Structure formats: structure tokens, C-alpha cells
Amino acid sequence: VEFIKMTIHIKATGFDFTPALHKEVEDVMNSLAKFVQRWDEEGSVLLRVEIARTTKHHHKGNVFYAEANLDIPKKVLRVEETNTDMHAAINILKDRLKNEIVRYKEKMTDH
């Protein structure tokens, strides 16, 4: 089985974004590649992920904001998550994006 990878641009601000974290984000997000494989074969898929440490006045400590924009033909799917745990934020982001992809595919097959 060939492992599918998509083009992913990752931007991180406000914290130390180590190579290990970069790889984690890539690995988690690449698990979605099978859902966009048909579009990716056309070379028309780009996933942009942004992760930032933010300060929310009603939270103590670190709060991470994660956002993903998936450029697919004729559409941009966008999801976001705010969480005190960066790893949880990344995984929730992936799950939300997967749901958006599935919803979009269902819409496309209905027409």
C-alpha cells in the first residue's frame, strides 16, 4: 500500500515549534490524504495549517489556536479549534476537517 501525502504548509507562532511537533502535525494531517486523493491526483489540493499560542483572559496558562484551510477544487474547507492542549487541538482539528471533507463529498455526489 502506497502512503499518500498531500501538500501541507504549516505556520506556527508564539511558541517553540520543534521539528518533532512539525512532524506530528504533518503525520496527523496526512491521515486525511486518502479522503482527498482523487483531487490530489489532479494536483489541486493544498492544506494550510496555522497553530498559535494565544492568550485568552478567562484561561490560565497556554491556550492554543489551530486553524486548517483545505484548498480543493472550487472550494476551501476551513475549521478551527482552541484548546489548552496543543496535541488535542491538532487532533480535533483533523477530525473536524475530516467531517467537512465527508460532508462536501456527500454534497457533490447528490448533484
Protein language model features and the residues they cover:
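N-terminal, polar/charged subdomain of small-to-medium soluble alpha/beta proteins
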Residues: E2-H111
